[in-house]
């Protein structure tokens, strides 16, 4: 019924060459529960993902929440619901057709979502590669109510029809109501009532990058790895494990972080569409190498990142661990160098491969 994301091989390869460092910094631990402040309640900022039958739901550290529905026939279409944490916010529902030939549909063709015989026409998103449409404003509330109570949903356009699963829809929306303090309020997704809503979103952490520094002598193009890093037992092991491909072994990159610190990335594993590197923070010339500690939204730091790129102008290191080659599922992360450490800037994650573009994945971590 669903197309699962396969990250197992990459994670096993990663684990074979790395061990988390004791005492490594992690993303700031958000509140586990809501907190009362005056007459308002500060919502929980704990990132979380849940599965409700066929539906996936997630809320990030700012209490922005999402729910996703797959097509009954795998890889044919999807539905995305998002809801900001403001008590008066309205949900946004997006749908996407991903069936064979969908990309050739007339760009002006309407996308229609029919729920138990009731048709809702969505506004097309103009700049999407695949047919994607959006319900928003006052038109979205009837759609949400129908999804929660519905038995059958069909997405159609230009003669194509794709059935979307509603199994778990009401439970996923109820969970979002609970996370955002909407139960029994007028703006609840499912359990609507008259209780006044008085909630405040959790404050997002502020991340400030260190000033940019010159990069003369650093970058890509297979720089020579300093001897102090080559001598590390973990690096020797991973050099051996990547020796089957001479091009993988050359995927070393470096950067100057400041006058006293450098960044060096060493290939650790490679697959058809993922390249993992271990990152070290060193002294000048690669001396005194220490594995970098990259915090993650769910609290477990790592020193290995996948398909990584470092932008010295913004002091940002990005990673994109693909669940499959087309990149419609996986984990996308960015960290900012503050002058003392790499701090998580943002993270989004799509566990199910169903054709959702990466810019529409649910966020787990956001910053200011």
Protein language model features and the residues they cover:
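Structural motif
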Residues: 272-280, 327-333
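A generic "folded-domain core" signal
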Residues: 17-244, 254, 275, 344
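Surface-exposed loop/turn elements that mediate protein-protein interactions on large endomembrane-trafficking
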Residues: 231-241, 281-297, 336-341
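Sec-dependent N-terminal signal peptides
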Residues: 1-21
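Exposed beta-strand-loop-beta-strand "reactive/processing" segments of non-cytosolic proteins
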Residues: 252-272
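Short consensus segments that form the blades of beta-propeller domains
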Residues: 102, 268-272, 323-326
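Short aromatic loop motif centered on NTY/YTY
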Residues: 290-368
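Beta-propeller blade termini
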Residues: 250-256, 305-309
């Amino acid at each position: 019924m669903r197309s699962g994301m396969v990250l197992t091989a990459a994670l096993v390869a990663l684990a074979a060459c790395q061990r988390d460092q004791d005492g490594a910094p992690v993303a700031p631990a958000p509140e586990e529960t809501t907190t009362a402040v005056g007459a308002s309640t500060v919502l929980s900022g704990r990132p979380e993902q849940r599965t409700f039958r066929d539906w996936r739901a997630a809320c990030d550290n700012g209490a922005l929440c999402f729910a996703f529905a797959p097509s009954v026939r795998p890889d044919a279409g999807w539905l995305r619901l998002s809801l900001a944490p403001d008590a008066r916010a309205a949900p946004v529902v997006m749908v996407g057709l991903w069936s064979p030939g969908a990309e050739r549909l007339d760009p002006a063709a309407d996308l229609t979502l029919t729920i138990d015989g009731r048709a809702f026409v969505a506004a097309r998103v103009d700049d999407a590669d695949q047919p994607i449409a959006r319900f928003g404003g006052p038109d979205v509330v009837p759609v949400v109510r129908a999804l929660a109570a519905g038995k059958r949903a069909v997405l159609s356009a230009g003669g194509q029809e794709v059935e979307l699963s509603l199994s778990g829809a009401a439970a996923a929306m109820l969970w979002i109501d609970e996370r955002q303090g909407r139960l029994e309020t007028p703006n609840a997704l499912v359990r609507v009532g008259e209780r006044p809503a008085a909630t405040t979103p959790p404050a997002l952490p502020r991340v400030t990058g260190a000033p940019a520094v010159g990069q003369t002598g650093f970058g890509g193009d297979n720089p020579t790895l300093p001897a102090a890093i080559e001598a590390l037992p973990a690096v020797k092991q991973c050099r051996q494990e990547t020796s089957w491909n001479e091009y993988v072994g050359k995927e070393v990159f470096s950067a100057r972080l400041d006058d006293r610190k450098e960044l060096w990335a060493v290939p650790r594993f490679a697959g058809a569409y993922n390249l993992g590197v271990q990152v070290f923070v060193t002294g000048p010339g690669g001396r005194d190498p220490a594995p970098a500690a990259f915090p993650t939204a769910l609290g477990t730091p790592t020193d290995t990142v996948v398909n990584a790129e470092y932008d010295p102008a913004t002091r940002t290191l990005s990673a994109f661990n693909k669940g499959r080659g087309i990149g419609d599922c996986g984990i996308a992360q960015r960290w900012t160098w503050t002058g003392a450490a790499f701090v998580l800037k943002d993270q989004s994650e799509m566990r199910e491969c169903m054709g959702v573009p990466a810019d529409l994945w649910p966020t787990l971590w956001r910053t200011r």
